[in-house]
Amino acid sequence: MEPKTSAAGTVQHLDHFVLPVMQPERAEKFYVEVLGGKVLRKMNDASVNRTFIKIGQNHIGLFSQTKAVLPKPETLDSFPRYGFVVSGDDFQKIRLKLHVADGLARKIEKRGIATGCGADEGIAFADSEGNLVELFRGEGDAPARLHHLHFDTLDLEESIRFYTDILRLTLLERDKGLAVIGVPSRQSIVLHEVAELSPVTTTTYRGRHFAFHVRDEDFHAIVERLHRAGIDERDDHGEREGRRPEQLGTYFKEPSGFRLQITNEDSATFAAHAR
């Protein structure tokens, strides 16, 4: 057991996530050719294909599925949804490519708390595999970055308590079954209270998780809070292949069942070691 710490136990930023894919080559083609990503590493074996792709400041993982199926989306308003912000030039290029790809896509009309993204121009679409993605036009020519997540929840109060008490995140806004949880580095998690969780939310997909970068001392403080709350955390929830000895990381579930990770490695460090 780790010694008790006086650290605040806060996260630094939403660093990366892993998405389920049905056809790895098709998914890689989409994220490279349409979203402008760069392949960092491929790790394949008989049970799973893993592709890690750099998108601006962050990276995502694309993990093949042998049992669970990702359904074709019927709407762009389901859950979960994954949001990026890109430069104005990149936004225009990607929007044109999405129309050429002839996928499910539309302009985001909502503003403010419903998007978690203020008044920036945006577009919602489904990737080649059926994952729901949102893209917003950022200011200036800053590189692309992860910006927000949309999660559904059966109990908004419980979810708010989890993110504010366990991860020490901030409740920014709340209105009519919606809550925006602020993540440092100008990121957010938008929580939507629903009567029934999305099938994609409740399905267990191999490797799917959402990772937050933390400092070493904050890692141990968060683990202490998880233990006090009776929340199970363990590293063998995840994929250990490629883990460096000095890397800290553990996995646990939030109230809707999404698997979260805290780790002291960030996307920049991962990219340096990935090749």
PLM features: residue spans?
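Residues that act as N-cap/strand-start positions at coil-to-secondary-structure junctions
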Residues: 47, 78, 117-119, 175, ...
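N-terminal beta-strand motif that seeds the catalytic metal site of vicinal oxygen chelate
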Residues: 1-25, 81-82, 136-160, 187, ...
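Acidic (E/D-rich), amphipathic helical modules within compact regulatory domains
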Residues: 42-52, 56, 85, 108, ...
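Vicinal oxygen chelate
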Residues: 2-9, 13-22, 51-54, 71-143, 224-275, ...
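Structured core of small recognition/catalytic domains
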Residues: 145-150, 157-262, 266-273
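Core segments of cupin and vicinal oxygen chelate
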Residues: 9, 19-66, 151-195
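Short beta-strand/turn micro-motifs at beta-sheet edges
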Residues: 3-6, 68-72, 136-138, 194-200
